[in-house]
């Protein structure tokens, strides 16, 4: 499955001339805490939506056939939704943005259901627990560290492109060693991105970008959601033997 993070949710919404469209607002500590808590809340709800859809897909052969037969359309829709939410956030209401996020989470649940179904249950549980622990540790680090993690953003996006290119090359070579390397790099990459995103959320960078705590919380939730899902998928590759 292609990495939905390649849609670059780090891009700031701009006008046709390239200037920011959101007004600058002052972000105090209370606003920062409210924003961070809302971002995590919507992220967890999005994960529950994806998990619920993935479970239903795993129990329904008809849904599996539907997802398999429309996989390309699902991937295109996921990319379009990620672009739409990230780049169009200032042109839509917070309610619409949140609704689109949940639609995105549900569509990704369809593809996740297919992926998870191809692994042993023990591997899935181990990958989920490991991803949860690493995500939690990175989130705590991003919250408490005094170190500026700004440089991680640009480096990580280039790393994602590198992973995608390596994955495409590996389709032809089917190298288990390269698969392991890609998976390990992916785990490190999205662990670092989690810390980076949490720090930016706490600092109120997304509130400044969108001019709204509610809208910024949706963008924050999308980023954290993608961090966790990709971390889980790379961990699943490792626990599943790296052959898929």
For the regions a language model picked out, list residue spans one by one.
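A hydrophobic alpha-helical transmembrane-helix feature that marks the membrane cores
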Residues: 1-244
């Amino acid at each position: 499955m292609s990495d939905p993070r390649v849609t670059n949710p780090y891009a700031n919404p701009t006008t046709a001339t390239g200037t920011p469209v959101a007004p600058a607002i002052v972000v105090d500590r209370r606003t920062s805490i409210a924003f961070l808590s809302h971002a995590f809340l919507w992220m967890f709800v999005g994960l529950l939506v994806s998990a619920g859809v993935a479970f239903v897909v795993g129990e329904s052969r008809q849904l599996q056939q539907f997802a398999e037969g429309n996989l390309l359309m699902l991937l295109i829709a996921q990319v379009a939704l990620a672009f739409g939410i990230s780049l169009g956030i200032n042109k839509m209401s917070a309610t619409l943005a949140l609704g689109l996020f949940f639609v995105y989470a549900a569509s990704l649940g369809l593809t996740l259901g297919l992926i998870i179904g191809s692994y042993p249950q023990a591997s899935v549980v181990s990958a989920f627990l490991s991803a949860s622990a690493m995500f939690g540790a990175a989130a705590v680090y991003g919250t408490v560290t005094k170190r500026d993690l700004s440089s991680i953003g640009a480096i990580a996006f280039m790393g994602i492109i590198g992973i995608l290119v390596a994955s495409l090359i590996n389709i032809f070579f089917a190298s288990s060693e390269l698969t392991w390397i890609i998976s390990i790099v992916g785990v490190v990459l999205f662990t670092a991105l989690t810390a980076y995103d949490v720090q930016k959320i706490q600092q109120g960078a997304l509130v400044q970008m969108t001019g709204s705590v509610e809208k910024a919380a949706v963008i924050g939730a999308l980023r954290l959601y993608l961090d966790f899902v990709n971390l889980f998928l790379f961990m699943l590759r490792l626990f599943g033997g790296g052959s898929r």
